[in-house]
Amino acid sequence: MIGPALRQAYMLYLLALLFAIYTSSASFAWGADGLTIEPPVIELNGPGEQVQIRVLNTKGEDVTAACVFKSHDANTVRVSNKGQVTSNKAGQTKIEVVNQSLVQLVAVKIAEADAGSKVTFEKDLQPILTRYGCNAGSCHGKQRGQNGFQLSLLGFDNDFDFYAITSESRGRRIFPASPKDSLLLKKASGQVPHGGGKKLPEDGNAYAQVLEWIKNGQPRSTHDELKVVNIEIIPSEVKMLPRTKVQTRVLARYSDGTSKDVTHLAAFQSSESVLASIDAEGMIQSGPLPGEAAIMARFMEKFSVCLVTLPLPETLNVNLPTRIDSQHYIDRLLSDKFVKLGLSPSDLAADHTYLRRVYLDLIGRLPTPEESRSWLAETAPDKKEKLALRLLSRPEYADFWANKWADLLRPNPFHVGMKAVFVLHTWLRDCFRKNLPYDQFAKQIIAADGSTFRDGASVVIRDKRQPDELTTVISRLFLGIRLECAKCHHHPFEVYGQDDFYHFAAFFGRIGKKGTGISAPISG
């Protein structure tokens, strides 16, 4: 018969053994063979702060959508089923992340809110208005607003928006005596009819921030407040299988070197939603088709892009991807892209197909029957290269491509006169005949100096008389970007704003011109 003392010792031994087994299996899950959590430790500054969790398995695959999240203290911090963490009060706790048989705990530390920290218009309200589409081009950000309420497109004009919300229409949108009855909140939360629908649920963090801003007297940001330097979407590049999910995170980096998770305030957009769509919480959902898509995240006039690649399934690709047998750098780039997308390059074009294409591309016409028979009969291994060089030395090449560039530059004879237009066209043909390097070609146009009767490059500067016109043309032709959208407001799909447009235009602001340049053909 076992005595009480021996029984107690035996029970303690069993408990110790069970604890050792549990911790060893747990350390196996938490170690190198377990889950990877981003961020590994969550630190929040006061209540109302939010962070998005990403979970990766041992293969580096995103499994956030397949995880179960649980807060050990829901009074301190709560977590959604998509891994979005929201602080309720200062304290410490842990969040449990479960994926199949793997379990991991994430430490959460919530500090007391800074005494000087407060909700301000530029720092907090504008991101909310942008995140929920209030200042989008399809809503109040359109040219004349919506239903009597206009905001600047994507919040590019803080002064205009602040006045529209707090003072316009006799200040009817804000009710400081009873902040929760403010029209701004009642419309956005759906308490009164709103054409845009319910945007801010009353139990949501965004609603609470707008309410606090109204209660505190609608403060604005000060000049010494931290500024957003840039944002980063994580991951910046991802390869996905069809019909899978990947969670993104958006980090904002500030002027003092600190960073903050702003996934919940970022606005997302996909370039090809059929291939890869993204929801408001930053979860990417791939479609059934292979291809590439760019996911854009926008926050406080800053942009970041995640490139999504969906390679062709091997079961659909009979031939394995092979590299192009070429030393040309363009072919090498194409080869890398083919391998990345799981594509096999097409076979080389037949000689007669190549002949037709190279004639049309270089001199803009088909080969004659005699030219075709002569070249097809050649047996030299480098006959394609020799043909291209011969075509590049022909006068038709210069005429054909000068005409293309004249279409791009589009000189107006009513601005510069017919003679100047002919001078420009002659200069373009000479550039192609002499094989002028492209950088020198661009330099001669941008830094043109001379008469439009003698210097063809100066016709472009003379024709586009205003700095903003030159900015539009030069940015399109030589930078490959469209800056004209940023002339009136921040570019809706690029990183460029009004400052970028007018800083660029300032380069052309001091160009001097002589002569009237009004009546054709006397300008010169």
Regions found by a protein language model. Name each.
Residues 29-131, 140-147, 151-152, 159-162, ...:
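Extracytoplasmic soluble-region selector
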Residues 129-134, 480:
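Flanking scaffold residues of small Cys/His-coordinated metal-binding clusters
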Residues 168-171:
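Acyl-group handling in specialized metabolite and lipid biosynthesis
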Residues 1-11:
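N-terminal secretory signal peptides that target proteins for export/translocation
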Residues 146-149, 180-209, 345, 408-418:
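Axial heme c-ligation environment in periplasmic c-type cytochrome domains
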Residues 138, 151, 155, 160-166, ...:
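Short, structured secondary-structure elements
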